[in-house]
Amino acid sequence: MTEVFLMDERLFKLLGNADGTPIVDAAGWLRRADEYAALIERCMLGSAPVDHAVRGETISRRPALEGRALYEIVEIHYGPHLRYSFLAHIMRPARPGRFPAITFNMFTQSYGCPRAADAIERGYVIAMFDKEQLFHDQRTHRTDACDAYPGCDWGAIRIWAWGHSKLIDYLEGQDYVDTGRFVATGHSRGGKAALAAGAYDARIAVTAPINSGCGGAGCFRVLGDRAGENGDPLREESLGRIAAVFPHWWRKGFERYGNMEPPHAPGPEHALPFDLHALKALVAPRALFSVEGLDDAWANPYGTYLTWQAAQPVFDLLGAGENNCVMYREGGHAFGEEDWGYLLDFCDWRFFGKGEPYWNNGARCLG
C-alpha cells in the first residue's frame, strides 16, 4: 500500500466523542452512532416514520425460469389506514425452504435482474420495487409517501431507503424468507438509498450500494478518480453540485454545506459535522459491500476508498473487521451481470461460508 492510501487526516476519526475523549468499546460506539445517525438525519437525509404496518395483496403469480421460480406482483399498502401503496415484483425459488431476500430499488419500471437464474439457483429471493412510486424524481412533485407522513422532513433518498424497509416489513411475514438474511442493494441514486436503508434498518444483514458516489459510499471532502486525488468537480460529483441539481433528494438546508455556484468546487463541505465514512460505519457490525467502477470518475472511486478505510476502525472495534468490503472492477457506471455476480458471491460467502474473499482490492487498482 502506497503512502497516498494512508488514512486521510481530513476524514476525522470516528472513534472519538464530541468532547474529544476516545471511544474504546462497543457501548461507547453505539452511543456515538446514535449521535451520528441524528446528525446525518438533521443535516442531509431527514427523518423517516417508525411505522411497520403493511398489508400485501397479491396481484398476480406465475411460474418463471421454466418452473424453477415463481414471479409475483404484490401491492404493498402502507401509511395511515393503509391507504397508500406501491408495487413489489418478487421472484423466488419454486421449492420449499426459507431463502435470503435481496431488496432492490429500481428505476421506473425497469424490473429485472441479469443474474436472476443464477440467484434463484443459489437460493435467493429477489424483491424489486419502483422507488418513484414512493417519490417521483422531480424537484417540485410531492408524492404518496410525503402525503402519508406530512410531519417528516425527509428527502427522496431517505424515502426510497424507507421503501426497502417497507418491503422488508412485508417479506418478514412470508414463509419463504429467511428473516435473518436481508440484503439491500441499488445502483447510483438507488445505491445511495440502499446505503441509507442499511444504516438505519438493523434488519438488513448485507448493505450493497453499487456506484453510489456522492451522498452514498463516496466522500464529500476528497474527490478523485482511479489515478488518485484531483479535487475536480467537473470529473467527480461534489456536494454543491448534487445539492444544486437534485435538491429534492435531501433535507432542506443540506445545500449550505456545498458550493452552489458552478463548477461547484469543494470547500464548504468542511463545515459538515460528518463525512460518508460515518454513514458507512452506521452499518457496522453488519456487512457492507460496495461495488465501484474504476472508470466511473463521477462516483469518486478514490474518495470511496478513503471512506472505506476510515470506517474500518469501527468494524474492527465491533469484532466485524471482515464485514467492511469494497470491490473495484474495470468499467463505468452500471449495475450489470458482473456486479450481480460479485454481490451473489459476497452473500454466499457471508451467509453460507462459500468461496474465498477476492474483494477489498482498491490498493491494487487505484493510483
Question: What are these regions, as identified by a protein language model?
Answer:
Residues N211-L279, N300-W308, D316-A320:
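Mobile cap/lid helix-loop segments that gate and shape the active-site cleft of serine hydrolases
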Residues S110-G112, L134-D137, G191-A194, C214-C219, ...:
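Flexible loop/turn segments at secondary-structure boundaries
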Residues M1-S85, R92-G97, A202, R251-K252, ...:
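Alpha/beta-hydrolase-fold serine-hydrolase catalytic core, especially in secreted/extracellular enzymes
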Residues R98-I102, R122-I126, D178-R181, A202-V206, ...:
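Loop/turn elements at helix/coil->beta-strand transitions in domains of secreted/extracellular proteins
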Residues C113, K166-L234, R241, P268:
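Primarily recognizes the serine-hydrolase "nucleophile elbow" in alpha/beta-hydrolase
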Residues G97, T103-G173, G213-D225:
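Cap/lid segment of the alpha/beta-hydrolase catalytic domain
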Residues A117, L195-A196, A281:
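Alpha-helical segments flanking ligand/cofactor-binding loops in enzyme cores
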Residues F129, T185-H187, P209-I210, V291-G293, ...:
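Generic beta-strand/beta-sheet core signal
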